[in-house]
């Protein structure tokens, strides 16, 4: 990618997201989504290869289809109700089409097949943007429409996403695909609580972004993209050996780490609404996520490579790029649970 084009591309991505998040008019919301989508395609092909080109095409086709469905829903809602504001989407069919379009953009099941493939075909940092920043605009639309969503359809999509994300990551050895399936599971948890308490969705999204950003930065420091490369952490960057397992356990939602907080408050919210079967099912299925995180932890801190030349301790470690925000992110990833009452009081 041309260095001169990078500021323009990233500025367009951020501007498109902010236009969508801050707008209450359907036309400007759609324009922001299109700006964001078209500017993100060069980021996916930052390192030109057949795999990245394929990933960009898959991303474009999926997002363009979702945008077409969204535009059709916006126009039909305007024809039937005469309203352009997002909070006045009263037509049931328009609401269903908008939910379908947003599920495609978020990568929720059964529209999730593009997420692992696109994430696998991009560099780690582009994958980080795909799984974090690109979720903000669709979730903001769902947040503003939370009062007019079809609860049964949303819960069905959420449970399907949790199942697809948990089962899909079981036999994977590619770290980017594992994190993509983890993202699908987290999207299911966020959308499940949206009709009951939208603020809990925002809390879940914030913690998810912190955990995912920390994980990607640690893997990028180690240049790890597979479980085999992850097992070389101890003799390449020794100080990462305790940090990667703790981050992965938090991403899996194990108490007393930060990742347990969103699952705790979501289950509590369902309990307040006299719903026990749905959160129990979600929690049991999510245990599969914890299983494949434990596999990664085993590869990082316990497994030794069979090649003797690769397992010798290096006498001089590699210099890594400075990451000033990483200590703060690691602290937030592991130690945020004790201040959760204060966070819940703000919400």
UniProtKB/Swiss-Prot annotation:
<keyword id="KW-0520">NAD</keyword>
<comment type="function">
    <text>Core subunit of the mitochondrial membrane respiratory chain NADH dehydrogenase (Complex I) which catalyzes electron transfer from NADH through the respiratory chain, using ubiquinone as an electron acceptor. Essential for the catalytic activity and assembly of complex I.</text>
</comment>
<feature type="transmembrane region" description="Helical">
    <location>
        <begin position="55"/>
        <end position="75"/>
    </location>
</feature>
<feature type="transmembrane region" description="Helical">
    <location>
        <begin position="201"/>
        <end position="221"/>
    </location>
</feature>
<protein>
    <recommendedName>
        <fullName>NADH-ubiquinone oxidoreductase chain 2</fullName>
        <ecNumber>7.1.1.2</ecNumber>
    </recommendedName>
</protein>
<keyword id="KW-0999">Mitochondrion inner membrane</keyword>
<dbReference type="InterPro" id="IPR003917">
    <property type="entry name" value="NADH_UbQ_OxRdtase_chain2"/>
</dbReference>
<keyword id="KW-0249">Electron transport</keyword>
<comment type="subunit">
    <text>Core subunit of respiratory chain NADH dehydrogenase (Complex I) which is composed of 45 different subunits. Interacts with TMEM242.</text>
</comment>
<keyword id="KW-0496">Mitochondrion</keyword>
<keyword id="KW-0812">Transmembrane</keyword>
<dbReference type="GO" id="GO:0008137">
    <property type="term" value="F:NADH dehydrogenase (ubiquinone) activity"/>
</dbReference>
<dbReference type="InterPro" id="IPR050175">
    <property type="entry name" value="Complex_I_Subunit_2"/>
</dbReference>
<feature type="transmembrane region" description="Helical">
    <location>
        <begin position="274"/>
        <end position="294"/>
    </location>
</feature>
<dbReference type="InterPro" id="IPR001750">
    <property type="entry name" value="ND/Mrp_TM"/>
</dbReference>
<dbReference type="GO" id="GO:0032981">
    <property type="term" value="P:mitochondrial respiratory chain complex I assembly"/>
</dbReference>
<keyword id="KW-1278">Translocase</keyword>
<dbReference type="Pfam" id="PF00361">
    <property type="entry name" value="Proton_antipo_M"/>
</dbReference>
<feature type="transmembrane region" description="Helical">
    <location>
        <begin position="123"/>
        <end position="143"/>
    </location>
</feature>
<dbReference type="GO" id="GO:0045271">
    <property type="term" value="C:respiratory chain complex I"/>
</dbReference>
<feature type="transmembrane region" description="Helical">
    <location>
        <begin position="13"/>
        <end position="33"/>
    </location>
</feature>
<keyword id="KW-0679">Respiratory chain</keyword>
<feature type="transmembrane region" description="Helical">
    <location>
        <begin position="178"/>
        <end position="198"/>
    </location>
</feature>
<keyword id="KW-1133">Transmembrane helix</keyword>
<dbReference type="GO" id="GO:0005743">
    <property type="term" value="C:mitochondrial inner membrane"/>
</dbReference>
<feature type="transmembrane region" description="Helical">
    <location>
        <begin position="96"/>
        <end position="116"/>
    </location>
</feature>
<dbReference type="Pfam" id="PF06444">
    <property type="entry name" value="NADH_dehy_S2_C"/>
</dbReference>
<dbReference type="GO" id="GO:0006120">
    <property type="term" value="P:mitochondrial electron transport, NADH to ubiquinone"/>
</dbReference>
<feature type="transmembrane region" description="Helical">
    <location>
        <begin position="326"/>
        <end position="346"/>
    </location>
</feature>
<dbReference type="InterPro" id="IPR010933">
    <property type="entry name" value="NADH_DH_su2_C"/>
</dbReference>
<comment type="similarity">
    <text>Belongs to the complex I subunit 2 family.</text>
</comment>
<feature type="transmembrane region" description="Helical">
    <location>
        <begin position="247"/>
        <end position="267"/>
    </location>
</feature>
<keyword id="KW-0813">Transport</keyword>
<keyword id="KW-0472">Membrane</keyword>
<feature type="transmembrane region" description="Helical">
    <location>
        <begin position="149"/>
        <end position="169"/>
    </location>
</feature>
<keyword id="KW-0830">Ubiquinone</keyword>
<dbReference type="GO" id="GO:0072593">
    <property type="term" value="P:reactive oxygen species metabolic process"/>
</dbReference>
């Amino acid at each position: 990618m041309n260095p001169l084009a990078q500021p323009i591309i990233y500025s367009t991505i951020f501007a498109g997201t902010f236009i969508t998040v801050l707008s209450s008019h359907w036309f400007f919301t759609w324009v922001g989504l299109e700006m964001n989508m078209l500017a993100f395609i060069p980021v996916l092909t930052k390192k030109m290869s057949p795999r990245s080109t394929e990933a960009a095409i898959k991303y474009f086709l999926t997002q363009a289809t979702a945008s077409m469905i969204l535009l059709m829903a916006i126009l039909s809602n305007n024809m039937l109700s005469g309203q352009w504001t997002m909070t006045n989407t009263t037509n049931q069919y328009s609401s269903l089409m908008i939910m379908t379009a947003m599920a495609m953009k978020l990568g929720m099941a059964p529209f999730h097949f593009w997420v692992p493939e696109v994430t696998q075909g991009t560099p780690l940092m582009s994958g980080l943007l795909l799984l974090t920043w690109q979720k903000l605009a669709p979730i903001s639309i769902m947040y503003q429409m939370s009062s007019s969503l079809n609860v049964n359809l949303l819960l069905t999509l959420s449970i399907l996403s949790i199942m697809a994300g948990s089962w899909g990551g079981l036999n994977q050895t590619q770290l980017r695909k594992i994190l993509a399936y983890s993202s699908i599971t987290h999207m299911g948890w966020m959308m499940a609580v949206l009709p009951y308490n939208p603020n809990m969705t925002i809390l879940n999204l914030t913690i998810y972004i912190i955990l995912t950003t920390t994980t990607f930065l640690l893997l990028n420091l180690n240049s790890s993209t597979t479980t085999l490369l992850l097992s070389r952490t101890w003799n390449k960057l020794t100080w990462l050996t305790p940090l990667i397992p703790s981050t992965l356990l938090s991403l899996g939602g194990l108490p007393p780490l930060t990742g347990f907080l969103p699952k705790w408050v979501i289950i509590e919210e369902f309990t307040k609404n006299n719903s026990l079967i749905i959160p129990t099912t979600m929690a049991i299925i999510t245990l599969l996520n914890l299983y494949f995180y434990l596999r990664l932890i085993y590869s990082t801190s316990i497994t030794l490579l069979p090649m003797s030349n690769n397992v010798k301790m290096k006498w001089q470690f590699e210099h890594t790029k400075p990451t000033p925000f990483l200590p703060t992110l690691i602290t937030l990833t592991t130690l945020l649970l004790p201040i959760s009452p204060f966070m819940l009081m703000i919400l």
